[in-house]
């Protein structure tokens, strides 16, 4: 998701995505000066300019796009940085060296029993030169770059899935089903390829019984989709939980001591969606069910809980997940400001100023 945002944003601003950084997790109330101060403290040796900021609805936070303006040491760019409101995340696409690219390209073609000359001949170019270089006709070179090299790059370089076999005791490097499925769903959103290619990459991650299940399904239905494969794996290897069990787990999940209410809501959401999938809660009632459980499960006795209770007691519809998080985070920000003011006042009374 983040990589898609980085690439689309760069495309819209005509910026090379390999010369850009995406920083997100920035609080909504953080202004440009605060963002710049945090960036400069975390990346003092990195030369950049800020191209823009936006509100990222899925993260309920701001994101910033930076363009790298000088020579870049990618090792000096942190993946995370401490900032206002917590940890800010950083994403970038470091360029691959020409030597590594050519090596992987030739290995890929060799596995398929092809050479660059074979590719050129199939594309209709007569008497191709032995190696791609400056003497290659511009028409041929451009065509190969656009129609062969770029698709090959997307096939050779992509984020791999973790391994899953479905065995009772996972082997080295293998995951149990639930963590594997969560990671797989995240990566599938990042891949900008056809469903056939997604299915091929999915098969790469499967071993043992899990691979056997998909091979059998594919032999019976060659057009089976990636989503159908994942659904089948979930039915075979996922946890068996009744609708009643899922509902009890949801209703008995409470806010932990020291946990922010917004974090509790996010932690509660997968449990709620599981209850909805099991049919214990109707989709039309999901917002009301979420609000009621947040009020019941919160151990916070301050203004936030009172505000939520008033929201639930009102005649209007219950807020959706995004609206609820915005409401809670606004109240959390107010409480943090009040606590900071109270601390400063106390320090003043004690003569620390």
UniProtKB/Swiss-Prot annotation:
UniProt keyword terms in alphabetical order: Nucleus, Tumor antigen
GO BP, sorted A to Z: inflammatory response to antigenic stimulus; positive regulation of apoptotic process
Pfam families (UniProt xref): PNMA, PNMA_N
Predominant localisation class: nucleus
UniProt note on tissues of expression: Testis- and brain-specific. In some cancer patients, specifically expressed by paraneoplastic tumor cells.
GO CC field: cytoplasm; nucleolus
Cell compartments where the protein resides: Nucleus, Nucleolus
Keyword flag Nucleus: yes
Similarity section: Belongs to the PNMA family.
Additional information: Antibodies against PNMA1 are present in sera from patients suffering of paraneoplastic neurological disorders.
Name listed for the protein in its UniProt record: Paraneoplastic antigen Ma1
Organism of derivation: Homo sapiens (Human)
Lineage start: Eukaryota, Metazoa, Chordata, Craniata, Vertebrata
Gene: PNMA1
